[in-house]
A protein has these predicted regions:
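Short, basic/aromatic recognition patches
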Residues: 40-46, 109-114
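Tandem CBS (Bateman) regulatory domains
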Residues: 4-31, 70-122, 139-155
């Protein structure tokens, strides 16, 4: 990734935004879909379908980020748990599913450089506060849309 650092240690994007604050891109917890770690497989499938997400954050009862569940994780779970009946999906919990890869969260104080670096490998970046409470996500799409509007304002 190419990042141009300006005087004062800020990247060109940080200078353009006028801040080093990932809250500019944050989709707050109240506006994004997520799963409780005790959710059933069926609940996970239904929530992901209704939200249109291919991956979704998992939170514990305290609201802390615990990981990411993907469509691929669900597909492999159906194979390994050997069921095609949705009633079985009501019995099994997402905690029984092996997850291929969790999206790594960032703190709300993370630099724009680190946020963009993380977003380059994850379709969304979970954001946590200093007590590890999940406060929302930053989507790769929101960063790309901002860059497009900034670089090509005539579009």
């Amino acid at each position: 990734a190419i990042m141009v650092t300006m005087a004062g240690g800020k990247t060109a994007l940080e200078k353009e935004i006028g801040m080093n604050n990932i809250l500019f891109f944050l989709l707050p917890k109240a506006m994004c879909a997520f799963l409780d770690e005790d959710s059933t497989i069926r609940q996970a499938m239904e929530k992901m379908e209704s939200a249109g997400y291919s991956s979704i954050p998992i939170l514990n009862k305290r609201g802390e980020y615990r990981g990411t569940l993907t469509e691929g994780d669900l597909l492999w779970a159906l194979k390994y748990l050997c069921f095609m009946d949705m009633r079985q999906a009501e019995i099994h919990r997402i905690s029984e599913i092996s997850r291929r890869k969790d999206n790594v969260p960032v703190r709300v104080t993370t630099s724009m450089h680190d946020l963009i670096d993380r977003a380059s490998t994850q379709n969304f970046v979970p954001v946590v506060d200093d007590k590890d409470a999940f406060i929302g996500i930053v989507t790769r799409r929101s960063i790309i849309q901002y860059c497009k509007q900034t670089l090509f304002p005539e579009d």
